[in-house]
Amino acid sequence: MTLFEPIRLGDIHLNNRIVMAPMTRSRAGQNDEPTQLTVDYYAQRASAGLIITEGVYPSYDGKGYVRTPGIVSAEQIAAWEKVCHKVHENDGKIVMQIMHCGRIAAAANKPDSARTLAPSTIHAAGKMYTDTDGMVEHDVPLEMTLEDIEQTINDYATAAQKAINIGFDGVELHATSGYLPAQFLSTGTN
């Protein structure tokens, strides 16, 4: 067995055993949509056995960082579909990583109606870059209600279904590195 031999991952046939890990690049367009630069970036890497996208927020509440892509609006969905098409055209496979930042967020990076939600109102240490204000402290999150939790679960499911519907070969849930799922599992944040 070598790195360059094909392998099956469930129902997905990979041309080799190389997996490109997710890397947040903060290059989304003005409406958090993948741009032509994004299409080209992933297409150039399609020879990897599998590409895992940068973290993609499932709802505006889930956005944390500046210029990161979502899969919420019709514009975002259409742009991700172009990415999928180009990767598949180049004989690649691609999985979307869905990432809800939870308390690792700054209001300046979100639409006005979006909230910073977490299991508890525990402020995250550190700062985050914003285009409008430079480096700012993370928001103090709102404690999620049961309704917020149910909505967030639905947001994940909806985002995953949208990804599959437009051609992604699968989805990965980012559940580590201090983001929302990990916040629920840690006594330091819940």
Where are these predicted regions, by residue range?
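Hydrophobic faces of well-ordered beta-strands that scaffold small-molecule active sites
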Residues: 5, 18-21, 51-53, 94-98, ...
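Catalytic domains of carbohydrate-active enzymes, especially glycoside hydrolases
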Residues: 38-58, 165-170
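Polysaccharide-binding and catalytic clefts of secreted carbohydrate-active enzymes
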Residues: 140-144, 172-190
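Acidic/aromatic-lined carbohydrate-recognition and catalytic surfaces
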Residues: 17, 55-112, 146, 187
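Non-globular sequence segments
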Residues: 93, 99-166
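Active-site beta-loop-alpha junctions enriched in small/polar residues
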Residues: 23-26, 56, 99-101, 176-178
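Conserved, mostly hydrophobic/aromatic
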Residues: 20, 45, 87, 96, ...
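Short, acidic/polar
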Residues: 33-45, 151-161
